[in-house]
Amino acid sequence: MKKFIALLLCGILTATALTGCGSSSAAGENGEVIVYNWGEYIDPETLTMFEEETGIKVVYDEFETNEIMYPKVEAGSSAYDVVCPSDYMVQKMIENDLIQELDYDKIPNAKENIGAQYYEQAAAYDPGNKYCVPYCWGTVGIIYNKTMVDTPPTKWADLWDEKYADNILMMDSIKDSFMVALKKNGFSSNSLDESELQIATNDLIAQKPLVQAYVVDQVRDKMIGGEAAIGVMFSGDAIYVIGENPDLDYVIPEEGTNVWIDGWVIPKNAPNKENAEKFIDFMCRPDVALKNFEYITYGTPNTAARELIEDEDLKNSPIAFQDLTQYNNLETFLYLGEDGEELFNKYWKEVMSN
């Protein structure tokens, strides 16, 4: 889901953790802050800036999926100060009492610089915006090669077009693949109606002979290299691949899609709460948010940072900063409970086994 360029953050990245971004493993003069974030989802230079300006050492750990992150936070064996979960996982963490309410007086940049529309979107999973500050956001849409696709796609059903057989890329992701199939049929991406889920399952099974591959990060290289005609992609990745291959374009299908938001939260057992607040406030500073946007290319909800973008095309990019009011049926993924997760897992196994 996140930016993939294989840069090493602050040196050697191990399979478990990054034990600090400075030259020494010792805590800074004002202590430390332990951050757990998606891989390649922050400009390393901003971590150095934070350390230099505050005297707080950043201890940095990375995860690949929300489902890998959650049990580590839940177990409490690794006490993190700041974590960056996605929308539905924020809701799950709230319901299971794993994160604490934020004091916006301690993070004034979050209050002043994050656009109201993003807080409104986030309220679907964080009522009252009590627990989470939006960090990045985006959509899921169709990426396509204009030299290989005759007519620009407008519907999710275009991913079932037989003329693109073996040239279609789908996401190796339960939530995202089912979102596509559910939206194709006019259903909610958060549906727990088994008749609707069965229809979506049947569609995904019927599509399988047409699909070249179920991918995550590989979709970028394949689309850049012209190895596929059409596929599913996150908007932030679309910005990157279009920059690498101008034959590519991105569209949100008319049936609607998922609008996702990742944000900063503070776990209940955070050992350095004050430093966590300073870190979140720093990341919401316009110049810092701009650096992170330019590094990871995912849309920033920081409206003050957007005003600092010098490239007018990027500043007004309909992909990076979509006008969501022009689309119908946009939804944020919600946490559907353990029974809901088991239901989606059951139907996904049916798709994969047929």
Short names for language-model regions:
Residues 1-33, 354:
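Short, low-complexity disordered leader/linker segments with a strong preference
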Residues 26-92, 221:
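Early extracytoplasmic/lumenal segment of secretory-pathway proteins
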Residues 70-71, 87, 91-137, 150-157:
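Hinge/lid segment of periplasmic solute-binding proteins
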Residues 94-101, 121, 126-130, 210, ...:
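Ligand-binding "clamshell"
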Residues 100-111, 132, 246-258, 267-270:
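Short beta-strand->loop
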Residues 169-173, 177, 181, 189-253:
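Ligand-binding pocket segment of bilobal, Venus flytrap-like solute-binding proteins
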Residues 267-327:
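Mature extracytoplasmic/periplasmic domains
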Residues 324-354:
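Conserved C-terminal helix/tail region of periplasmic/extracytoplasmic solute-binding proteins
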